[in-house]
C-alpha cells in the first residue's frame, strides 16, 4: 500500500480507537452511576464494553504496528497479532451470555431470580475472559509459523538473526484462523445466538397471541412482555452488527485458505475489512443510546455534568422505585406497598437490599426505567394508584409524575 494509503489507514484506526474508548467508557460510567442500570444483563454489557475499550487502547495500536511490518522476534510479533483475537472472543462470549440471559427472562421469568444472580454472572464473566485468553493465545503454544526455516515466507532479508517481518498472516497460520478461530469459536456462537433470539421472538409472539385471546387480557403482563421484546430486539441488533463487521474479514481468510491458487485479496481490501472489524467496538454505545431510554438519559446527564460542566445533581431516571422516596411534613419515612409487597424504599431514596437483582420482567436494560428493586408485576395502574396515594399523604412530594407515569413503557 502506498505511503498515502498507509497514513489514511492509520488516521482512521486512531479515530476509531478514540471513539471506542470514549463511547464504551461512557457505557461503564452510566452503569456505575445509575442504579437502574445495575442489573445482571448489564454486567455482561460492561464486560462487552471493557473488551471494546481494550480494542481501542491495545488492539488497534498493535494492528497499526503490525501493518508496518517491523522486525521483531517471532513470538513477540505473535502476541501482538493474537491479542485482538482474545478481545474478539471475549465480545462473542459476552454477546452469547446476554442472549441466554434474555432467553431465560422471557421463557421462565418466575425462575429468573433464582437462576441468574449477580454472583453467578460475575463468575460466568470471569470464565469467559479466561477462555478468551486461552483460545486467542493458542498460537503462542506452538500452532504458529515461527518454526519455519529462515528462508520461509515469514522472514525478511532486512531483519536480523532470529527476527521476522511482523505481518499477521506470516506468523498466524491460516488453518488456525479458519478452522479453530472462525468455524469453532465465531461461527458456532453466532449461530447459537441466532437460534436463541429466534426462539425468544417466537415465544414472545406466542405469549402475546395468548394474551389477546383472553377475555380480560393483563395489560401489565402484556406491557412487560413488549418491553422484553424491545430489549431483545436491541441486543439482536448488536449481534447482527457484530456479524456484519467481522464476517467479511473471516470470509476473506476462508478464500485465502481454501483457494491457494486464487489471487490474494488486494491490500486495500484487507485493510478495509480490518477497519470494519474494529468499527464494531464503536457502534454499541450508539445502539444503547438510540434504543434504551435509561442509557440515553444517563449519557445526557454525564455529558452535561462532566463535559459541558453544567452542574446538576445526578439522579436516576424518575421511573425507578429507588426514586420514589416520599417524605411527610415532619420528615418521617412513609412506607410504600406495591401490589401488596413492600419494596423497601426509604425516605432518602435508597433501598435496604441493594444487592437484590431484578427478575426477567424488570431489568433496567429492558425498560430503561424499571427499578432493580421494583416488583415484577407492577404496572401502570399500580403506579397511578400509588401516585394518588402519595399525593394525598404528602402534597409537597413530587409523586410519580416522571417518565414512567407519562409514557408507561419506558422504552424509546
Swiss-Prot record:
Q: Which SMART domains match?
A: 7TM_GPCR_Srsx
Query: Might you name a Gene Ontology BP term for this protein?
Result: response to purine-containing compound
Keyword annotations for this protein, in alphabetical order, are: Cell membrane, Disulfide bond, G-protein coupled receptor, Glycoprotein, Membrane, Receptor, Transducer, Transmembrane, Transmembrane helix, Ubl conjugation
Query: What are this entry's molecular-function GO terms?
Result: calmodulin binding; enzyme binding; G protein-coupled adenosine receptor activity; identical protein binding; lipid binding
The family database entries (InterPro entries) matched by this protein are listed as: Adeno_A2A_rcpt, Adenosn_rcpt, GPCR_Rhodpsn, GPCR_Rhodpsn_7TM
**Localization, UniProt:** Cell membrane
Q: Which residues lie on this side of the membrane: Extracellular?
A: 1-7, 67-77, 144-173, 259-266
| Chain positions covered by the region annotation Disordered | 392-412
Primary localisation category = membrane
Its transmembrane ranges are 8-32, 43-66, 78-100, 121-143, 174-198, 235-258, 267-290
Q: From what superkingdom does this record's organism come?
A: Eukaryota
PROSITE patterns in alphabetical order: G_PROTEIN_RECEP_F1_1, G_PROTEIN_RECEP_F1_2
Gene3D superfamilies from the UniProt entry: Rhodopsin 7-helix transmembrane proteins
For this chain, the Swiss-Prot or TrEMBL PTM comment says: Ubiquitinated. Deubiquitinated by USP4; leading to stabilization and expression at the cell surface.
Which residues take part in binding adenosine? 169, 253, 277-278
One Pfam family named in its UniProt record: 7tm_1
Membrane topology, as annotated, equals: Multi-pass membrane protein
Signal peptide segment: none
Gene Ontology CC: one annotated term: plasma membrane
| UniProt feature coiled coil, ranges | none
**Which residues point to the Cytoplasmic side?**
33-42, 101-120, 199-234, 291-412
* Stored CDD domains: 7tmA_Adenosine_R_A2A (cd15068)
Q: What is known of its domains?
A: The cytoplasmic C-terminal domain is necessary for targeting the non-ubiquitinated form of this protein to the cell surface.
Family, per the entry?
Belongs to the G-protein coupled receptor 1 family.
Give a short account of what the protein does.
Answer: Receptor for adenosine. The activity of this receptor is mediated by G proteins which activate adenylyl cyclase.
Q: What is this protein called?
A: Adenosine receptor A2a
Amino acid at each position: 500500500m502506498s505511503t498515502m494509503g498507509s497514513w489514511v489507514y492509520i488516521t482512521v484506526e486512531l479515530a476509531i480507537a478514540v471513539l471506542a474508548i470514549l463511547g464504551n467508557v461512557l457505557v461503564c460510567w452510566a452503569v456505575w452511576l445509575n442504579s437502574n442500570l445495575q442489573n445482571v444483563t448489564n454486567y455482561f454489557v460492561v464486560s462487552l464494553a471493557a473488551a471494546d475499550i481494550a480494542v481501542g487502547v491495545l488492539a488497534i495500536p498493535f494492528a497499526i504496528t503490525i501493518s508496518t511490518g517491523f522486525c521483531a522476534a517471532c513470538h513477540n510479533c505473535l502476541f501482538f497479532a493474537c491479542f485482538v483475537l482474545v478481545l474478539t472472543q471475549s465480545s462473542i462470549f459476552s454477546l452469547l451470555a446476554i442472549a441466554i440471559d434474555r432467553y431465560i427472562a422471557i421463557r421462565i421469568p418466575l425462575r429468573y431470580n433464582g437462576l441468574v444472580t449477580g454472583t453467578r454472572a460475575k463468575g460466568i464473566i470471569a470464565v469467559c475472559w479466561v477462555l478468551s485468553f486461552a483460545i486467542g493465545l493458542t498460537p503462542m503454544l506452538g500452532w504458529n509459523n515461527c518454526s519455519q526455516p529462515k528462508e520461509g515466507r515469514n522472514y525478511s532479508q532486512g531483519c536480523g538473526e532470529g527476527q521476522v517481518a511482523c505481518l499477521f498472516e506470516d506468523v498466524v497460520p491460516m488453518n488456525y484462523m479458519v478452522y479453530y478461530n472462525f468455524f469453532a469459536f465465531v461461527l458456532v456462537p453466532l449461530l447459537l445466538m441466532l437460534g436463541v433470539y429466534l426462539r425468544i421472538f417466537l415465544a414472545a409472539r406466542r405469549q402475546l397471541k395468548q394474551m389477546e385471546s383472553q377475555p380480560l387480557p393483563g395489560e401489565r403482563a402484556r406491557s412487560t412482555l413488549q418491553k422484553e421484546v424491545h430489549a431483545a430486539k436491541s441486543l439482536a441488533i448488536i449481534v447482527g452488527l457484530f456479524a456484519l463487521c467481522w464476517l467479511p474479514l473471516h470470509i476473506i481468510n476462508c478464500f485465502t485458505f481454501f483457494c491457494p491458487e486464487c489471487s490474494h485479496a488486494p491490500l486495500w481490501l484487507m485493510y478495509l475489512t480490518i477497519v470494519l472489524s474494529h468499527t464494531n467496538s464503536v457502534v454499541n454505545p450508539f445502539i444503547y443510546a438510540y434504543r434504551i431510554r435509561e442509557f440515553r438519559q444517563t449519557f445526557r446527564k454525564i455529558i452535561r455534568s462532566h463535559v459541558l460542566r453544567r452542574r446538576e445533581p445526578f439522579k436516576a431516571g424518575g421511573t425507578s422505585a429507588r426514586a420514589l422516596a416520599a417524605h411527610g411534613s415532619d420528615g418521617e419515612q412513609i412506607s410504600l406497598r406495591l401490589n401488596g409487597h413492600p419494596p423497601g424504599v426509604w425516605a432518602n431514596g435508597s433501598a435496604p437490599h441493594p444487592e437484590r437483582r431484578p427478575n426477567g420482567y424488570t431489568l433496567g436494560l429492558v425498560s430503561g426505567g424499571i427499578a432493580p428493586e421494583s416488583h415484577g408485576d407492577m404496572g401502570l395502574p399500580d403506579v397511578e394508584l400509588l401516585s394518588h396515594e402519595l399525593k394525598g399523604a404528602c402534597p409537597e412530594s413530587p409523586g410519580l409524575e416522571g417518565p414512567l407515569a407519562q409514557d408507561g413503557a419506558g422504552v424509546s
